[in-house]
């Protein structure tokens, strides 16, 4: 063949092929869904390009995909008359994987076949799924608008290399022939192939036809029979659509193997006319946190496909939402640049955002278990919402879930509505603490007084929490209050002490002055506190001071961190504080004060500037 050359697969392709064949074999029939889905995409792309260049149809505007098989040759062929590919596109699409993060994704694969199967499904195997059932795959293709002699031949046994060559192909589009492995004869059975196509492809708008052979007058007559509904699912009446159809359509557009958690299908008429079909996946995509992760909705205008991954219709904190929007108000020649500045886009974004938040609120109300699944997968992303979307902050806040002293569990199951319903009489604020871990939050000395008073505290231990709480300032008219910061409401609780305690506290004023003199400007203030029960001392920050957790976030991001000036608070009822106050020897007094401060700093920050000095001091005082 003219222009023939043999090329090696990109190393990631070889690895993916091996993993896929072994991980997906139990669900091998999906190869047909994937190949028909690709054909549907090729038809969508041709329709879009033909809007500005109708000649691309080459006189054949009836788009379809045809499936045929040859029992003697043991081949199955899927052919479309969509946009097709030129030689460079064949090499790019069939010889390499252009997705960023592919290498790290493949390295994450392990020996758990069920988990690997889900991960590969999320990754989107597309064309390569043909090798699950075929030991050789042949592709013949020609790009729409190219001359017949610019056709391309591609063939591979999926073992490290492929052959590409130039051919003459009179009709545009792509024809994929699978040379089936031994034992895969079920895919040469007419009834079996029909049932798979009906199962997976009823929802797509592209007609799927199967070859029909009949004997007439001693001759074989070939005709094509359409076997799917070939009506875009979102254009149908909701009452006519079964859950299975919604699930299969999700898998088609999301390239996912698992059913979604929930969906919302709506047709809106009036000032704006559009149809939306929005899905919440049941698991996070493998590249959710990748900077180059593509997200957004499929965009159709008047049922004509325009683009994938139109991120302009969803805020970033809802980037996990999959689905489509079909608008009657946007122009057919719309571009990403036009979308960015369009009033129609902004209005649609606002409406769709509210729709998703309502869908999540309904899921949380109707099925707490499913909502927990959602929260575990996407809670960290949703926590970006309060900072990004002030207009919907209250709705987002209702969807947040936290660990709490009420449940005594690290599971984030407590809603803010739950918390408010349990607030004590006279309690005006929602108390929370941020820490590096659930254990650090749960065992923080800042909680001692509130525990004693039976006041619930939210335990926040995700890295994003401190940043989120800078924007989430109130809920249901109740202000949020970090228990690690100085605050009147906490001091008010702490000041509920008897007269004898006040007298004892007055007697300790000279001790407080000694500590202030010793520490100087290393701390912002030294004072006695009654907010502690078991701990001798803590450090807190002023309301306007940067918190410890925020300082850690700045440091982790490589930014300069201003020095945090702490308030050093001492528990006058604790034996170590009393012993320190009674110590007259200045050197010994200094050692005790430094130990108490180091303990408080260690509890607050989880680290010390000089841990060896801390250990030396503690050992020395233990034996003295």
UniProtKB/Swiss-Prot annotation:
GO terms for cellular component: cytoplasm. Residues 337-552 are annotated as: B. It is found in: Cytoplasm. Keywords: ATP-binding, Chaperone, Cytoplasm, Nucleotide-binding, Stress response. Residues 553-624 are annotated as: C. Residues 1-336 are annotated as: A. One of its GO terms (molecular function) is ATP hydrolysis activity. SMART domains: HATPase_c. SUPFAM superfamilies: ATPase domain of HSP90 chaperone/DNA topoisomerase II/histidine kinase, HSP90 C-terminal domain, Ribosomal protein S5 domain 2-like. CDD domains: HATPase_Hsp90-like. Transmembrane segments: none annotated. The keyword Iron does not apply. Belongs to the heat shock protein 90 family. PANTHER family: HEAT SHOCK PROTEIN 90 FAMILY MEMBER. Homodimer. Molecular chaperone. Has ATPase activity. This is Chaperone protein HtpG. It comes from Salmonella paratyphi B (strain ATCC BAA-1250 / SPB7).
């Amino acid at each position: 063949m003219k222009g023939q050359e043999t090329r090696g697969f990109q190393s990631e392709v070889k690895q993916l092929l091996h993993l896929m064949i072994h991980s997906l074999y139990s669900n091998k029939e999906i190869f047909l869904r994937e190949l028909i889905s690709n054909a549907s995409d090729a038809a969508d792309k041709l329709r879009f390009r033909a809007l500005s260049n109708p000649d691309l149809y080459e006189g054949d505007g009836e788009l379809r995909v045809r499936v045929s098989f040859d029992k003697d040759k043991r081949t199955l062929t899927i052919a479309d008359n969509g946009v097709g590919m030129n030689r460079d596109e064949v090499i790019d699409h069939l010889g390499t994987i252009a997705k960023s993060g592919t290498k790290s994704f493949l390295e994450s694969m392990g020996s758990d076949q069920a988990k690997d199967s889900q991960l590969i499904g999320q990754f989107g195997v597309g064309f390569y799924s043909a090798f699950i059932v075929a030991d050789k795959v042949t592709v013949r293709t020609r790009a729409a608008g190219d001359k017949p002699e610019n056709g391309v031949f591609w063939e591979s046994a999926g073992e490290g290399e492929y052959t590409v060559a130039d051919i003459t192909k009179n009709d545009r589009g792509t024809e994929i022939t699978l040379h089936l492995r031994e034992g895969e004869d079920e895919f040469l059975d007419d009834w079996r192939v029909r049932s798979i196509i009906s199962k997976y492809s009823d929802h797509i708008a592209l007609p799927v036809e199967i070859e029909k052979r009949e004997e007439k007058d001693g001759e074989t007559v070939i005709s094509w029979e359409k076997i799917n509904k070939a009506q875009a699912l979102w254009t149908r009446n909701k009452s006519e659509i079964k859950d299975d159809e919604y699930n299969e359509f999700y898998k088609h557009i999301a390239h996912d193997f698992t059913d979604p958690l929930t969906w919302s299908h709506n047709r809106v008429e009036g000032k704006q006319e559009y149809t939306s079909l929005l899905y919440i996946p049941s698991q996070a995509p493998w590249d959710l946190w990748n900077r180059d992760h593509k997200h957004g909705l499929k965009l159709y205008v008047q049922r004509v496909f325009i683009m994938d991954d139109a991120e302009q219709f969803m805020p970033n904190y809802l980037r996990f939402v999959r689905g489509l929007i079909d608008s009657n108000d946007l122009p057919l020649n719309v571009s990403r640049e036009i979308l960015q500045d369009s009033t129609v886009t902004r209005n649609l974004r606002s409406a769709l955002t509210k729709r998703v938040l309502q869908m999540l609120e309904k899921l949380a109300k109707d099925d707490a278990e499913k909502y927990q699944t959602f929260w575990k997968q996407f809670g960290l992303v949703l926590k970006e919402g309060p900072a990004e979307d002030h207009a919907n902050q209250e709705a987002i806040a209702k969807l947040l879930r936290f660990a709490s002293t009420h449940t005594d569990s690290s599971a984030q199951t407590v809603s803010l509505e739950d918390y408010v319903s349990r607030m004590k009489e006279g309690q005006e604020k929602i108390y929370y603490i941020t820490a590096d871990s659930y254990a650090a939050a749960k065992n923080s000395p800042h909680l001692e007084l509130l525990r004693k008073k039976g006041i619930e505290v939210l335990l926040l231990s995700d890295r994003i929490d401190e940043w989120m709480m800078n924007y989430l300032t109130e809920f249901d008219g109740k202000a949020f209050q970090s228990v690690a910061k100085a605050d009147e409401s906490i001091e008010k609780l702490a000041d509920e002490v008897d007269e004898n305690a006040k007298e004892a506290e007055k007697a300790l004023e000279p001790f407080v002055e000694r500590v202030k003199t010793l520490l100087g400007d290393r701390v912002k203030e030294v004072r006695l506190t009654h907010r502690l029960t078991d701990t001798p001392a803590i450090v807190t920050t002023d309301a306007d001071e940067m918190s410890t957790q925020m300082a850690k976030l700045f440091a982790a991001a490589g930014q300069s961190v201003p020095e945090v000036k702490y308030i050093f608070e001492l528990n006058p009822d604790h034996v170590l504080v009393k012993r320190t106050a009674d110590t007259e020897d200045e050197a010994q007094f200094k050692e005790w004060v430094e130990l108490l401060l180091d303990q408080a700093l260690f509890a607050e920050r989880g680290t010390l500037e000089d841990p060896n000095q801390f250990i030396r001091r503690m050992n020395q005082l233990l034996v003295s």
